[in-house]
């Protein structure tokens, strides 16, 4: 049995580190006020009738897989996806991005491949890449790290924080394209350390390890913005399902409980990781998206409209759960958490 912590990633410790860092950042300009969003998906500052929204993220250890496969033409899509998918979670439209590339050494050919992916991601997200920084740091970095920061914009009266999420609302899940850009440390440990596979070896269902792990993260910008702008849909909450899985729903409203009891069958990649690594169900749902990359919370009567828009963009979607005031699990009252029903048991995501 292997866990994410065994692979070197301790989510609980990361939470503590983030809180420690944020606790020391107290300065605020008096003339340009930040939006009070707490630990949401993105940050924002007031700009007239608008909020300017900023979000930053990177590709993480997926870059190690790209180096193993010597294939870098899609990691730019991943970086942009991780940023823009976060920005839209407060209803903002991404408009521009700057990238940060840190390397020990890089060839022109690899740089071209990365640029190709960045361009494809920019096209899919409908944003401008307006600049960036390339840092050559041979004493610090052995490989390549790719990150970026996105700028987005939303009218003040149109920001979506999740405060209106209430019991009775439904959770519509939009399918992921695969592993996306989270949980790669655990996936690599399972495939390469435990199963002793090579990057080009085939998995039990025919795809190679490289094909599965380098499948680009799905970009949800266009369908989600269409949902937000549809006057017949009241979007109450939006969640990018990344590291930590459905526990991210708590960012929207931690006064209610999110009951996920109608998930589609997990994608083959997740079943393969679980089988080869003997990974417990609980650990799978704390680490991976398990086939759902984005959640939209709406009134029950709006669910089919959301699904129809997702399908228009060739994204499978379905109602995967609902919002409740509380839930009783094994005699305990659960409030302010996500609970997943899977294999006839309840998994509580703290």
From Swiss-Prot:
Give the catalytic activity: 2-formamido-N(1)-(5-O-phospho-beta-D-ribosyl)acetamidine + ATP = 5-amino-1-(5-phospho-beta-D-ribosyl)imidazole + ADP + phosphate + H(+)
UniProt subcellular location? Cytoplasm
Question: What are the UniProt keywords, alphabetically?
Answer: ATP-binding, Cytoplasm, Ligase, Nucleotide-binding, Purine biosynthesis
GO biological process, any: 'de novo' IMP biosynthetic process
Cellular compartments per GO CC:
cytosol
Cytoplasm as a keyword of this entry, yes or no, is yes
Q: Report the principal subcellular site.
A: cytoplasm
For whether the record's keyword set contains Nucleotide-binding, the answer is yes
Task: Name the Enzyme Commission number(s) assigned to this protein.
Answer: 6.3.3.1
Associated pathway: Purine metabolism; IMP biosynthesis via de novo pathway; 5-amino-1-(5-phospho-D-ribosyl)imidazole from N(2)-formyl-N(1)-(5-phospho-D-ribosyl)glycinamide: step 2/2
Question: GO MF terms on file?
Answer: ATP binding; phosphoribosylamine-glycine ligase activity; phosphoribosylformylglycinamidine cyclo-ligase activity
Q: Which domain of life is it from?
A: Archaea
Q: Name one Pfam family in it.
A: AIRS
HAMAP family in the record: AIRS
The entry sums up its family as follows: Belongs to the AIR synthase family.
Name-wise, this protein is Phosphoribosylformylglycinamidine cyclo-ligase
* Species: Methanocaldococcus jannaschii (strain ATCC 43067 / DSM 2661 / JAL-1 / JCM 10045 / NBRC 100440)
Lineage of the native species? Answer: Archaea, Methanobacteriati, Methanobacteriota, Methanomada group, Methanococci
Gene from which this protein is expressed: purM
């Amino acid at each position: 049995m292997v866990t994410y912590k065994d692979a070197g990633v301790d989510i609980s410790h990361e939470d503590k580190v983030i809180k420690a860092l944020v606790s020391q950042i107290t300065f605020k300009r008096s003339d340009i006020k930040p939006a009070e969003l707490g630990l949401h998906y993105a940050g924002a500052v007031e700009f007239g009738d608008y909020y300017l929204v900023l979000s930053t993220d990177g590709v993480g250890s997926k870059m190690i897989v790209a180096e193993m496969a010597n294939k870098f033409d899609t990691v730019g899509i991943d970086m942009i996806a991780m940023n823009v998918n976060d920005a839209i979670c407060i209803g903002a439209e991404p408009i521009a991005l700057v990238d940060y590339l840190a390397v020990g050494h890089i060839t022109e050919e690899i740089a071209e491949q990365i640029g190709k992916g960045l361009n494809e991601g920019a096209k899919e997200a409908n944003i401008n890449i307006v600049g960036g920084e390339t840092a050559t740091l041979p004493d610090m970095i052995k490989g390549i790290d790719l990150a970026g920061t996105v700028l987005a914009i939303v009218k003040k009266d149109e920001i979506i924080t999740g405060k209106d999420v209430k019991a009775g609302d439904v959770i519509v899940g939009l399918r992921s394209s695969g592993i996306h850009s989270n949980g790669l440390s655990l996936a690599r440990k399972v495939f390469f350390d435990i199963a002793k596979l090579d990057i080009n070896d085939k998995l039990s269902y025919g795809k190679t390890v490289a094909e599965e792990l380098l499948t680009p993260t799905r970009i949800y910008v266009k369908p989600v913005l269409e949902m937000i702008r549809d006057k017949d849909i009241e979007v109450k909450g939006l969640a990018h399902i990344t590291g930590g899985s459905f526990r991210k729903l708590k960012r929207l409203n931690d006064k209610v409980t999110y009951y996920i009891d109608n998930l589609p069958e997990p994608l083959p990649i997740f079943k393969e990781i679980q089988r080869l690594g003997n990974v417990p169900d609980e650990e799978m749902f704390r680490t991976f998206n398990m086939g759902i990359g984005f959640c939209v919370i709406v009134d029950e009567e709006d669910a089919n409209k959301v699904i129809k828009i997702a399908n228009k963009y060739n994204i499978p979607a379905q109602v995967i759960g609902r919002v409740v005031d509380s839930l009783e699990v094994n005699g305990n009252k659960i409030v302010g958490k996500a609970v997943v029903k899977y294999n006839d048991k309840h998994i509580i995501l703290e």
